[in-house]
From Swiss-Prot:
<dbReference type="InterPro" id="IPR028923">
    <property type="entry name" value="SAICAR_synt/ADE2_N"/>
</dbReference>
<keyword id="KW-0547">Nucleotide-binding</keyword>
<dbReference type="GO" id="GO:0006189">
    <property type="term" value="P:'de novo' IMP biosynthetic process"/>
</dbReference>
<dbReference type="InterPro" id="IPR050089">
    <property type="entry name" value="SAICAR_synthetase"/>
</dbReference>
<dbReference type="GO" id="GO:0004639">
    <property type="term" value="F:phosphoribosylaminoimidazolesuccinocarboxamide synthase activity"/>
</dbReference>
<keyword id="KW-0436">Ligase</keyword>
<comment type="pathway">
    <text>Purine metabolism; IMP biosynthesis via de novo pathway; 5-amino-1-(5-phospho-D-ribosyl)imidazole-4-carboxamide from 5-amino-1-(5-phospho-D-ribosyl)imidazole-4-carboxylate: step 1/2.</text>
</comment>
<comment type="similarity">
    <text>Belongs to the SAICAR synthetase family.</text>
</comment>
<dbReference type="GO" id="GO:0009236">
    <property type="term" value="P:cobalamin biosynthetic process"/>
</dbReference>
<dbReference type="GO" id="GO:0005524">
    <property type="term" value="F:ATP binding"/>
</dbReference>
<keyword id="KW-0067">ATP-binding</keyword>
<protein>
    <recommendedName>
        <fullName>Phosphoribosylaminoimidazole-succinocarboxamide synthase</fullName>
        <ecNumber>6.3.2.6</ecNumber>
    </recommendedName>
</protein>
<dbReference type="Pfam" id="PF01259">
    <property type="entry name" value="SAICAR_synt"/>
</dbReference>
<dbReference type="InterPro" id="IPR033934">
    <property type="entry name" value="SAICAR_synt_PurC"/>
</dbReference>
<keyword id="KW-0658">Purine biosynthesis</keyword>
<dbReference type="InterPro" id="IPR018236">
    <property type="entry name" value="SAICAR_synthetase_CS"/>
</dbReference>
<dbReference type="InterPro" id="IPR001636">
    <property type="entry name" value="SAICAR_synth"/>
</dbReference>
Amino acid sequence: MEKLEMIYEGKGKKMWSVKGHDDLLIAEFKDDLTAFNAEKKGSESGKGALNNKISTALFKLLKSKGIETALVDTINDTEQVVKKCKIIPLEVVVRNIATGSLSKRLAIKEGTVLPFTLVEFYYKDDALGDPLVNDEHCIIMDLVKSENDLDRLKHLGREINSILLPFFKEKGLKLVDFKIEFGVDKDGNILLADEISPDSCRFWDSVTNEKMDKDRFRQDLGSVKVAYEEVLRRILS
C-alpha cells in the first residue's frame, strides 16, 4: 500500500492519503511527546512503535466485543491503515479515578475512586486550550448533528470502559481515565478512531500506583519508553 501525500500532522501522528484507495488513510505514529497543550515538548525513540502496537491490540479487543473501529490493518511498526472518516471535534474523556484536571478543577483528591464512570466532552481546539463543554455547548456549536449523537458518544465511552476496565485489572493495571475520539464514515456510522495508548490513557500499577503513561513525561517521572514497554508486555501476556 503506497502513501501519497501527508494530509494532516498532529501531536502524535501523521496522516497520509493512499494510492488507489480514496476511502483509506495511513496513520503514522510519531516518537514526539507533548504536554500542557504542546507547551512542553520532547521525543523518545521507539515511542511511536509502542503506541501503534498497544493501540492495535486494544482496537482488536474492542472490535471482538462489538465496537466498530476505524482500524483496518497494521502494516509495519509505526503505521496502520484506517478507514477515512470525518472526525467529530470532541475529545470524549472517560474517568474512573480522580486525577489531573478533574482534581484541580473540583478539588477532588487524586486517587479518589469515582462513584460512577464520568464521561466528559472537550472541544478539540488548541487555540482555546481544548475547553470542557456540555451538551448544550455541543449543540449550539454544531459539533454534532443532534443530542442523540451525544448520547451515543456517552454510551460508547461507557461501553468501551466496561470492556477495558476488567481487562486491565487482570493485567495488574488501574485504568484511571482515558481520552477517545470518534469519526463518522461515508455511510454515517460512528466509529472509534484515533488511538488508545499510554499517550491517551492513564495507567497506574495496581499494587504500587506507579504511573505508566504520559504523566511520566508531564511530571518528569522517568523513562516513558520503559513504562510503555511494560504496558505492552502486560497487554500481550
